Regions:
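Conserved N-terminal structural module of periplasmic/extracytoplasmic solute-binding proteins
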Residues: 4-11, 21-102, 118-120, 253, ...
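Extracytoplasmic/periplasmic substrate-recognition and gating elements
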Residues: 62-63, 157, 246, 284-349
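A structural signal for short loop-to-beta-strand junctions that line the ligand-binding cleft
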Residues: 85, 92-93, 119-154, 187, ...
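Hinge/lid segment of periplasmic solute-binding proteins
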Residues: 98-149, 201, 205, 291-294
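Short, solvent-exposed loop/beta-turn-alpha elements that line the ligand-binding surface or hinge
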Residues: 112-126, 189, 193-196, 211-236, ...
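Extracytoplasmic/periplasmic solute-binding protein
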Residues: 136-140, 145, 171-223, 269
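C-terminal capping/gating helix-and-loop segments adjacent to ligand/active sites or protein-protein/ligand interfaces
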Residues: 139, 309, 349-355, 369-408
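Glycine-centered hinge/linker elements that transmit conformational signals in sensory
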Residues: 174-175, 220-253
Length: 408
């Protein structure tokens, strides 16, 4: 227990020190194949949508004659891959940054999008990533994350979502499931894997909650002045995850995203922290059985909290590319968000809510459940992790979380 207290202090230091230190129409985009000029090279951030982007690229090439190459970075490796690819002669023409912090590294490579056709399709200027008067990026998806749950298993345990309104009530349900897991045949949580395919869920997405609440309290919007007010809350939700899961806390360093997905899909766990993007991987559970809860961490007034909703996905066009390639890339982007095929692929096949005029009602039950919280007057939690100082900072938090879990 003494070592656990030491590692707990390391976790506080990793967060607090890092924070202070860091601190048109579809026809517009169509062209005759014989007149096709330029090419598109898209470095995709989302491994879970790789297949859909590959299919969409082929469809666009078939329709226009413009070559579209899609390379998908491995989970957690996007920045490293982007640096490597940008150093090549055939660099990506379309890439993405996660917000202001990510933009700082790539702003000299960003073409000004403010006069582009795709910018005119945005439903709000809030979805543009600005660098002064320059529109350096455009959000292409709005997503939500929280605690996905299996309604049937929760009912079997004797509860419903109505019984969970804050951290204390959630803790009661979770620990009761753990106390009866042998009889029930399932655990409360999926594994909180801390390998590279899964650790972002906790070192980034879960860490957003204490940052969000301190930003809200202090009226700040960056980590320079943060004090770490809610780090104890961060620790207690992490304790709940790792002590009531399908595996021992000491095993988390080798557990993967696929392990957690399998835990959930096979009915071995009720709760699974993830987001709307995970729908295609878990839809076999059945739409009637899928729900999503806010991530409660024990903050006063959290009964009025909704789901974490926002974006860290901003398209940027490489200003160093040739004029033909830049135009081809702009045309491809516009086609994706205006054409029937493009919009269907993004909204239906990828399950996205897109911040463009032709967004379709989602078939993704997690999107609709998340939206219902807002419709019911619950306050969505903004995504503030794009203001985290660096990937190195996040990795420091991840290492502290892993060490903390490994201490018996």
């Amino acid at each position: 227990m003494k070592m656990r207290k030491v590692v707990s202090a390391m976790l506080v230091a990793a967060m607090a020190t890092g924070m202070v230190a860091g601190c048109g129409s579809s026809s517009d985009s169509k062209s005759d194949k014989k007149d096709a000029k330029g090419k598109v090279y898209y470095l995709n951030f989302k491994p879970e949508q790789d297949e859909q982007w590959q299919d969409l690229a082929k469809e666009y090439t078939k329709e226009t004659g413009v070559d579209v190459t899609v390379l998908t970075a491995a989970s957690g490796e996007y920045e490293k891959t982007l640096k490597s690819e940008m150093a090549k002669s055939n660099a990506p023409t379309l890439f993405q940054v996660n917000g202001p912090v990510g933009l700082a590294s790539w702003k000299d490579y960003c073409y000004d999008l403010k006069d582009s056709d795709v910018a005119k399709q945005l439903t709000s200027d809030d979805f543009a990533l600005m660098d002064g008067d320059k529109m350096s990026g455009i959000a292409y998806v709005i997503e939500s994350y929280g605690i996905i749950y299996n309604k049937e298993l929760l009912k079997k345990a004797g509860y419903s979502a109505d019984d969970i309104t804050n951290f204390d009530s959630f803790k009661k349900v979770v620990e009761d499931i753990t106390a009866n897991k042998d009889k029930l045949g399932f655990s409360a949580f999926t594994s909180a894997g801390m390998d590279g395919s899964s650790d972002w869920r906790f070192k980034t997405h879960l860490a957003n909650l204490p940052i969000y609440y301190e930003y809200k309290d202090e009226g700040i919007d960056n980590t320079d002045a943060i004090k770490g007010t809610y780090l104890d809350n961060y620790r207690q939700i992490w304790d709940l995850y790792i002590n009531n899961a399908t595996c021992k806390p000491t095993e988390l360093s080798t557990k993967t995203a696929d392990d957690a997905t399998a835990d959930f899909v096979t009915g071995d766990a009720v709760f699974y922290q993830n987001g709307t993007w995970e729908y295609n991987n878990i839809k076999d559970v059945g739409d009637d059985n899928l729900g999503i809860l806010p991530i409660y961490i024990g903050v006063e007034g959290e009964e009025d909290q909704g789901i974490c909703t926002g974006t860290e996905n901003y398209w940027c066009v490489n200003s160093k590319a040739s004029e033909d390639d830049i135009q081809a890339t702009l045309d491809f982007m516009n086609w994706c968000v205006t054409s029937d095929d493009g919009v269907k692929a993004m909204c239906k096949d990828m399950g996205f809510t897109i911040p463009f005029k032709k967004n379709l009602k989602s078939d993704n039950v997690l999107v609709n459940e998340a939206n219902k919280y807002t419709e019911d007057g619950k306050a969505p939690v903004s995504w503030n992790f794009s203001t985290m100082p660096s990937e190195e900072w996040k990795n420091g938090v991840g290492s502290a979380l892993t060490s903390y879990a490994a201490d018996p």
